[in-house]
Structures are given as C-alpha cells and as structure tokens.
Amino acid sequence: PRTRRVKRSDGRGNGGTPEEKRPRTAFSGEQLARLKREFAENRYLTERRRQQLSRDLGLNEAQIKIWFQNKRAKIKKASGQKNPLALQLMAQGLYNHSTVPLTKEEEEQ
C-alpha cells in the first residue's frame, strides 16, 4: 500500500513544533477486492484469519483490523439503526446528546 506523511501543528493553534500525523493507507484495488470479499463472508476476523490476510496482502494486522472496524461502522451509520440500550435510555430521558445553553448562574459556578 502507498502511504503519505502529513505534518500538523501541535493542536494549540500557535504553530508549535509540527508532529508527524499517522499516514493514511491507500489500498490497491486487489487488496480492496480481497478485503471486501472477506468482509462479505464474515464481518469479524479471527486472529488467525487476520494474520493470514496480513501475509497474503502485504499489510500489517493493524491495517486490516482498522479496515474491518471502519467498514462495520460505515454500515451501521448507513443503516440508521440505534443501539437498543440507547433507545431505552432515550425513552427514559437519560440519554440525550443535544446541548442547551447554560444560564448565567450555571456559567458562574
């Protein structure tokens, strides 16, 4: 796979010493086709299967693991399904990610 190095600031916005950002992996068409085929067979890999794919595709195990995680997350997001526990907590008013502005009293505390 091809990777690229990207410099970024220290995150404080003051242009401090640049640090190395983890490079993004550009998978080849052959690697992607194989990963997609494996994913279609099973959404979760055993350690042994991940090691085999790593050898076959010339990728490290972390790259394969992250690809599978990202693929599962993408499908979950696209399906719009919510976690049953999250739905139950929302029904009870205990799970809400919306924000509301603080009152002056709350800001002063």
Curated annotation (Swiss-Prot):
PROSITE patterns xrefs: ENGRAILED, HOMEOBOX_1, HOMEOBOX_2
| Disordered: annotated span | 1-31
Q: Where in the cell is it found?
A: Nucleus
Tell me which residues form the DNA-binding region. Answer: 20-79
Q: Which InterPro entries match?
A: Engrailed_Homeobox_TFs (IPR050720), HD (IPR001356), HD_engrailed (IPR000747), HD_metazoa (IPR020479), Homeobox-engrailed_C-terminal (IPR019549), Homeobox-engrailed_CS (IPR019737), Homeobox_CS (IPR017970), Homeodomain-like_sf (IPR009057)
Does Cell wall biogenesis/degradation show up as a keyword for this record?
Answer: no
Keyword field: Developmental protein, DNA-binding, Homeobox, Nucleus
Q: Which residues form a coiled coil?
A: none
Q: Name one GO cellular component term.
A: nucleus
Q: Name one GO biological process term.
A: neuron differentiation
- Single annotated GO MF: RNA polymerase II cis-regulatory region sequence-specific DNA binding
List, alphabetically, the Pfam families matched: Engrail_1_C_sig, Homeodomain
Q: Which family does it belong to?
A: Belongs to the engrailed homeobox family.
Record protein name field = Homeobox protein E60
